[in-house]
Amino acid sequence: MTVFNPVWRVKIQGVAYTTYTLSNLTITSGRNNIYQQAQAGYCNLELLNLTQAIVNININDSVSIELQDSTATYVPIFGGTVVDFGVEIITAGSVGINQVLKITALGALSRLPKALTDGVLSQDFDGDQIYHVLQDLLLNNWGEVPAALQWANYDPTETWANAQNVGLGEIDRPGNYELAARSSDRVDIYSLVAALATSGLGYIYEDSQGRISYADSTHRSVYLATYGYTEL
């Protein structure tokens, strides 16, 4: 059997911690069974800091866990934000100290239970209704952009679509099932989106870059027919 020696890369707020040693890593994401929608992904990791370098990690910093594939290209497998951070000194001497950085990160779905919406929806297909709910939270419009922010400040490779996208992934639209209209009734966004996804026989999930996505009822069969395999 071929020995699997994974090459990892941890990026926090866009900074790759290549001089640190990844000592422990746990990632949990998806759903527990087919009868419920996915919960927020969870990542717990420890980094050994043997370099005496100053650590600059804050709550809500972005976290990306990447794994090198057979072409030496790093592929993201988890994306989220820091919700807990601790530093533990494991050894100390006359020259310096060695630290363990303990980081807990949550995926994008953790944002939805904290956001409320009136949930007014017109009769439409499942994917379009879910997109309508999520885009108001995860896509900024011109009026929501700070006045001091100018297009010239963006990296040339960025477009408006990704520069102000704060977590919306692939949404299968329009979907396969037409859902009833919904009148104003205040609810948290997770409960609403989960109910819409269940009604459409689809599922919400976090992609490897930490974005919230929706797969409709035929997503896997269409993907299989197109690419010859499906992602679990």
Predicted regions and their residues:
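Short conserved beta-strand and strand-loop elements enriched in small hydrophobics
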Residues: 10, 60-71
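A sequence-level detector of short linear motifs
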Residues: 18-19, 78, 214
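Residue-level detector of short, conserved catalytic/binding motifs and their immediate flanks
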Residues: 43, 80, 202
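Charged- and aromatic-enriched interaction segments used to assemble
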Residues: 71-74, 91-232
